Amino acid sequence: MISNAATSTPDRLTSTVRKTYPNFKVIVLNDDFNTFQHVSDCLLKYIPGMTGDRAWELTNQVHFDGLAIVWVGPQEQAELYHQQLRREGLTMAPLEKA
């Protein structure tokens, strides 16, 4: 016997929680062997949107303050920029959550 009665499903309360991916800081540390020019050139080469003036400001910050945050963004990109700068011989702090 087949029933023609309508079936109902219970109403569900669904909600989607969206979490943003955490950003990470790429931090260059001061050292005694990299020149101002080399640090500035590396920032220009690897950090997107970097200008010559900004690279020089950050290089001075590295020298006088001991460190500078040169880029903040998604982890995967931060890891790439960190690795590229380290490969060029810059002294890098570990990535930090922003």
Curated annotation (Swiss-Prot):
GO biological process: protein catabolic process; proteolysis
Coiled-coil spans in chain: none
Gene: clpS
Similarity field: Belongs to the ClpS family.
Protein name: ATP-dependent Clp protease adapter protein ClpS
InterPro entries: ClpS, ClpS_core, Ribosomal_bL12_C/ClpS-like
SUPFAM superfamilies found in the cross-reference section: ClpS-like (SSF54736)
Subunit-level organization: Binds to the N-terminal domain of the chaperone ClpA.
Organism listed in the record: Synechocystis sp. (strain ATCC 27184 / PCC 6803 / Kazusa)
Purpose of the protein: Involved in the modulation of the specificity of the ClpAP-mediated ATP-dependent protein degradation.
